[in-house]
């Protein structure tokens, strides 16, 4: 077939799809029905003449808005989306400024921006055309929400041309998605009219609206966006962030009108104080002010830590507080048996959310805070997110209050509670094998995003499977069959057949069997073993059998593990029924070993290597795993014992330390040579 015909079809199909999206999803057509019909007729005629062009996803084969469904597949960011360090006082802000000035040897200009309380979004434009929108995720990869991002009023599908700022070949721009308060209130009013529960606060509703599978719903939610940073760019090298914002505005991207450029920490503090007084005058919620070094060259010199740039900080305002009645103190039992008291309160609105529950951590914390059941208590949302009981308003006591007494028996199974060892603040239910609460929480944990990531296995499903006796514990999950699920009402239809959710659960379980070893380790609910320690163990040992057979000393020697985690791993595998869980999973086909490349040489044995800055060819985890796989130690700080420092973009102070100590410095090419050939003889 002529390539010109294929190109003609591709351009026409893309144009029709664009108009379908504007009509069916955004409800904002830009051409008449007649003009659209003419485009569709031309496309249909072309496919009739060349039938091989007609594909199942062609606009001619889809009805209405069919096909516009957001799947939330994982996509990698071109540059990492870092977080921000926080300052909660003037002293902390001043100390940060002193570190910045000390590192660069001058007083920089700062940009002061409002810290919008929303959800982060990254947009990628290629030659001015929006090709992707993604959530922050873990900073390295996020969820693809491109269709939903296109429905946001502020997000242009094409960048506007500018004589002063040519459109770059590639532009990755970061921003915050949020609700204006009036739009949030209107949304909640409409939900109430439809007898649906309203959202608790604008941030949660923004996050939920951005993650709708049906982008038409997102379009109706009237989300807004403000851009506040750049990722990777090709053909665009601004000297300052201020200049970058001017360019973004010229291209039609939304930038804040409240950003101010100042010099000196005193001027920064003035802006912080001003917005503390006027935070409720803004059309959206804010929870602080972000302060950034404006000059890009100075940003590069300052570099970043593993989680946040050194050239920026978020000044967080004190969280809002409220008083309410403490109706009761109850306890919950977690998956590792920890018994946690929590406050049950008269619902009260704090920082935009309705709060009725708050953790009290342990009995010692209850005593330290001095709260009594029946007290009027002061609560706040730490970071405007987590509800916390600060303490009682003792002057309002009427004599009817009573002390909380920690139960001596598990509220779920009746087993006597105990401290695991002397001096522990927490008490636990030792009936870990059959306590109903621990069983529920462990089964639910197996399905979590940090473990096997089984979407169809929710809390309700975990309860149903255990209640029906379909599973005895989490070890039975991967052996489930359709007949097993039919023993529960949750997974069968009225006619007695397996429901769609049941079929989806079986499919999810089958796919989860191929998850990497570190996820298996997290799913086992070993005390203290989260994703970081699990990755380290999986990288070092490669299979579960080797981890099970390792000594405390061998485990503790793994970087990122240490003695406490090592002892917890050995203790866990010493229990017969724990090992039985692993045996059941292995028998059901769960992969308990990662594929290892024996051809990788152990040519870095005993060498301590530090990686600083970003390497275009390696993620941070990839570089770390490459070092560990060759017997080296991926260290986090530079010392006299460091053999090599690998320097990428924005290296920060580790580079300076390496120069000071005379440590060998490698660029990415040198790092690749080191991995391939080992250190020079």
From Swiss-Prot:
Keywords: DNA damage, DNA repair, DNA replication, Ligase, Magnesium, Manganese, Metal-binding, NAD, Zinc. Zn(2+) binds at residues 410, 413, 429, 435. It holds the Pfam family DNA_ligase_OB. It is an enzyme of class 6 (ligase). It catalyses: NAD(+) + (deoxyribonucleotide)n-3'-hydroxyl + 5'-phospho-(deoxyribonucleotide)m = (deoxyribonucleotide)n+m + AMP + beta-nicotinamide D-nucleotide. Its EC number is 6.5.1.2. DNA ligase that catalyzes the formation of phosphodiester linkages between 5'-phosphoryl and 3'-hydroxyl groups in double-stranded DNA using NAD as a coenzyme and as the energy source for the reaction. It is essential for DNA replication and repair of damaged DNA. This is DNA ligase. It comes from Mycobacteroides abscessus (strain ATCC 19977 / DSM 44196 / CCUG 20993 / CIP 104536 / JCM 13569 / NCTC 13031 / TMC 1543 / L948) (Mycobacterium abscessus).
